[in-house]
C-alpha cells in the first residue's frame, strides 16, 4: 500500500528499529485465495506446429533461401501437366472445391401474392425490384451474403422480413446442392512450385533458392496417430543449370542439422514419381539423439524425415521451364513431434480436442484450482481469522480444558469477543491434523503434515496452496461470526472434529479439478483429526 516517505524518514531518525519493524504493516496482506500460487503470471505458449514452422523459416533464411507463397488452389489441368499418367492417382487424393449454384428464380402470381402478404405495402414496382435483384444474383453481380441486405435496402424493409420471405416463398434456395468445380486444394507443394517457377522466369534469371511453408490437403481414408487430412509442408527448390542430387543432400543436412540431427543416410525412394528424373528421388533418414530409447518405432534414433529429387524435364517443359530444379520437402508435423516429444500427430496438432489428446495438468495448475470456500468479508472478520490462527499456533498443544481469547472489538456495530476453546478434559486445544497443509503431489490433492516423511511433496512450493486446515477453519469461523452478528444472535460456535472430506474443513475444488482427478483415477485425501472449536460472544 502507498506510504508517506517524509513520515517514514522522520520515524526512522527517531527509532530506526521500530520504523523498520513497522514496515510490514504497510505491506498489504494477501487473502487466502489470492496468495501464491493463485497469484501467478501467465505466459503464452506457441503451438508446436507453428513453433516448428517459425524455426524452419529462420533455418531456410539463414541458408540464403527466399520465401515464397505458392498457390493453394490448383486447377486439375495443372495436375495433369505436372504428373502426366500419374495424375489420376494424385487427383484421387485431392479435395475438389464445390459451390452452390445460383438458381434462376421465377416469381409467379401466387408468389407475388405471398410476398405482398408477408412484406406489406409492396406494390408492383417493389416486385420488379425483387426480380431485378434476384437476376443480378443469378449473374453474380450480387454476392450471396449481400442478397438479403440488398433487397431490404431497396424495399426499405427489415432484413428479418426478407429472410423469412426468401425462406417461405423461394424454397429453391433450401434445395440447392453443391456442384463440383475443376479446382482442387493443393495436395503436394510441387503443384504450386511449377506454377510459381514458371511465373518467376518471366521476370528473373536463375539461379533461384526458394522455400515455402504452407498447408497441403490430402484425402486420407481416415486420420490416425501418423496421418492427418491437412498438414504443413516445408518445401524448397533450387533452380540452377548445374543442380544435382548432391545439392539435395547438402540442403537436407544444412537444414536438419539446425534442429539437432547428427547423422544422415540417403536411400532411393521406391515410389519413383514421374515428376522426378529417374533415380533422383531420394529419401532422407536422419539420426536424432532425442529419439534414442523413445517409446516409438524410431527408438534407434533414425527416422525418415524428408524427400528430395530433381524435377523431370518432361514436367518442367509443360511450363516452359528450361533449367533443372531440385525440390526437397518435409512434413512439419513429423519434425514437430520430434522436437516436442509427441507420439500422436492428432494429439499434438489438436491438444484441445478430448478425442485426440490426453488431458494433462501439472501439480501447480491443480493447486490453483483449490480454494477456501467461506471467507470473511470485513476487515474485522479478517482480524478474527488471523487471531484464531495465532492462538492455535501459540497454544495448540495446551492441555484441556482451556480457552484463549483470539479477538475483541466492534463488528458491524456490535461488541464481539472471540475465543478458541476446548472444554473437554485430557485432550489439547487443537487436534494433530490442524496444521496439515493442502497441496498437490503427483496429481493427488492431499492434506499433509510438513515433516520429514513428506519432504518431497513440500519441496514444490508452486504446488502448495499455503493453506493449512487451521486457516481454512478459521476463515469459516470468522465468516459465521459475521453472519451471526447480522442476524442479531448473541452467540456463535463453530466446531470441527475429524475431517473426512474437503468441505468439512472449508476447502473446495474447482469442478474442472474434480473431473480431472476422477478421470485420471487420482485421489483427493484431505482428512484427519482437527478437533478445534471457536466461540463468539456478541453483545
From Swiss-Prot:
Classification via HAMAP family: Sep_tRNA_synth (MF_01674)
Known role: Catalyzes the attachment of O-phosphoserine (Sep) to tRNA(Cys).
Span of the signal peptide: none
Keyword match Magnesium: no
Name of the protein: O-phosphoserine--tRNA(Cys) ligase
SUPFAM superfamilies, A to Z: Class II aaRS and biotin synthetases (SSF55681)
Top-level taxon of origin: Archaea
Amino-acid positions noted as binding substrate in the UniProt annotation, renumbered to this chain: 188-190, 233-235, 275-276, 327
InterPro entries named in the record: aa-tRNA-synth_II (IPR006195), aa-tRNA-synth_II/BPL/LPL (IPR045864), O-Pseryl-tRNA(Cys)_ligase (IPR005246), Phenylalanyl-tRNA_Synthase (IPR002319), SepRS_C (IPR041590)
Family to which this protein belongs: Belongs to the class-II aminoacyl-tRNA synthetase family. O-phosphoseryl-tRNA(Cys) synthetase subfamily.
Assigned EC number: 6.1.1.27
Taxonomic source organism: Methanococcoides burtonii (strain DSM 6242 / NBRC 107633 / OCM 468 / ACE-M)
Keyword Disulfide bond: no
Oligomeric form and interacting partners: Homotetramer. Interacts with SepCysS.
Any one GO BP annotation for this protein: tRNA aminoacylation
Organism placement in taxonomy: Archaea, Methanobacteriati, Methanobacteriota, Stenosarchaea group, Methanomicrobia
Catalyzed reactions per annotation: tRNA(Cys) + O-phospho-L-serine + ATP = O-phospho-L-seryl-tRNA(Cys) + AMP + diphosphate
EC top class, as a word: ligase
Key words of the record: Aminoacyl-tRNA synthetase, ATP-binding, Ligase, Nucleotide-binding, Protein biosynthesis
Coiled coil: none
Entry GO MF terms: ATP binding; phosphoserine-tRNA(Cys) ligase activity; tRNA binding
Amino acid at each position: 500500500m502507498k506510504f508517506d516517505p517524509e513520515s517514514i524518514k522522520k520515524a526512522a531518525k527517531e527509532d530506526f528499529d521500530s520504523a523498520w519493524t513497522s514496515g510490514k504493516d504497510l505491506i498489504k496482506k494477501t487473502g487466502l485465495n489470492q496468495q501464491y500460487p493463485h497469484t501467478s503470471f501467465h505466459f503464452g505458449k506457441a503451438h508446436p506446429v507453428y513453433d516448428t514452422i517459425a524455426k524452419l523459416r529462420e533455418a531456410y533464411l539463414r541458408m540464403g533461401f527466399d520465401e515464397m507463397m505458392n498457390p493453394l488452389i490448383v486447377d486439375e489441368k495443372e495436375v495433369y501437366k505436372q504428373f502426366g499418367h500419374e495424375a489420376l492417382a494424385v487427383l484421387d487424393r485431392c479435395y475438389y472445391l464445390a459451390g452452390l449454384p445460383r438458381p434462376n428464380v421465377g416469381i409467379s402470381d401466387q408468389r407475388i401474392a405471398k410476398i405482398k402478404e408477408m412484406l406489406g405495402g409492396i406494390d408492383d414496382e417493389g416486385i420488379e425490384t425483387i426480380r431485378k435483384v434476384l437476376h443480378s444474383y443469378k449473374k453474380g453481380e450480387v454476392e450471396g451474403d449481400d442478397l438479403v441486405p440488398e433487397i431490404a435496402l431497396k424495399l426499405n424493409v427489415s432484413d428479418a422480413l426478407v429472410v423469412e420471405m426468401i425462406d417461405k416463398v423461394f424454397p429453391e434456395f433450401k434445395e440447392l446442392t453443391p456442384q463440383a468445380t475443376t479446382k482442387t486444394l493443393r495436395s503436394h507443394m510441387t503443384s504450386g512450385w511449377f506454377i510459381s517457377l514458371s511465373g518467376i522466369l518471366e521476370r528473373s534469371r536463375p539461379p533461384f533458392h526458394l522455400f515455402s511453408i504452407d498447408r497441403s490437403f490430402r484425402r486420407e481414408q481416415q486420420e490416425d496417430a501418423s496421418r492427418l487430412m491437412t498438414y504443413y509442408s516445408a518445401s524448397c527448390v533450387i533452380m540452377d543449370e548445374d543442380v544435382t542430387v548432391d545439392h539435395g543432400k547438402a540442403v537436407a543436412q544444412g537444414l536438419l542439422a539446425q534442429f539437432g540431427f547428427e547423422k544422415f543416410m540417403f536411400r532411393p525412394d521406391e515410389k519413383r514419381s514421374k515428376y522426378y528424373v529417374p533415380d533422383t528421388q531420394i529419401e532422407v533418414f536422419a539420426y536424432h539423439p532425442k529419439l534414442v530409447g523413445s517409446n516409438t518405432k524410431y527408438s534407434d534414433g533414425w527416422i525418415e524425415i524428408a524427400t528430395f529429387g530433381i524435377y523431370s524435364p518432361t514436367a518442367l517443359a509443360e511450363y516452359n521451364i528450361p533449367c533443372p530444379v531440385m525440390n526437397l520437402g518435409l512434413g512439419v508435423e513429423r519434425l514437430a513431434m520430434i522436437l516436442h516429444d509427441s507420439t500422436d500427430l492428432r494429439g499434438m496438432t489438436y491438444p484441445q480436442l478430448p478425442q485426440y489428446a490426453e488431458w494433462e495438468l501439472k501439480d501447480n495448475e491443480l493447486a490453483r484450482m483449490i480454494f477456501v470456500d467461506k471467507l470473511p468479508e470485513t476487515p474485522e472478520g479478517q482480524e478474527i481469522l488471523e487471531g484464531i490462527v495465532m492462538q492455535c499456533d501459540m497454544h495448540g498443544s495446551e492441555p484441556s480444558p482451556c480457552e484463549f481469547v483470539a479477538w475483541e472489538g466492534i463488528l458491524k456495530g456490535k461488541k464481539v469477543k472471540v475465543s478458541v476453546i476446548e472444554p473437554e478434559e485430557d485432550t489439547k486445544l487443537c487436534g494433530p491434523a490442524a496444521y496439515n497443509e493442502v497441496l498437490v503431489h503427483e496429481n493427488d490433492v492431499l492434506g499433509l503434515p510438513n515433516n520429514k516423511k513428506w519432504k518431497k511433496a513440500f519441496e514444490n512450493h508452486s504446488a502448495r496452496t499455503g493453506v493449512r486446515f487451521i486457516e481454512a477453519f478459521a476463515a469459516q469461523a470468522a465468516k459465521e461470526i459475521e453472519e451471526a452478528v447480522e442476524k442479531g444472535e448473541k452467540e456463535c460456535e463453530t466446531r470441527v472434529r475429524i475431517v473426512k472430506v474437503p468441505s468439512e474443513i472449508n476447502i473446495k475444488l474447482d469442478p474442472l479439478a474434480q473431473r480431472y482427478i476422477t478421470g485420471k483415477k487420482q485421489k483427493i485425501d484431505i482428512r484427519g483429526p482437527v478437533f478445534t472449536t471457536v466461540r463468539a460472544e456478541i453483545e
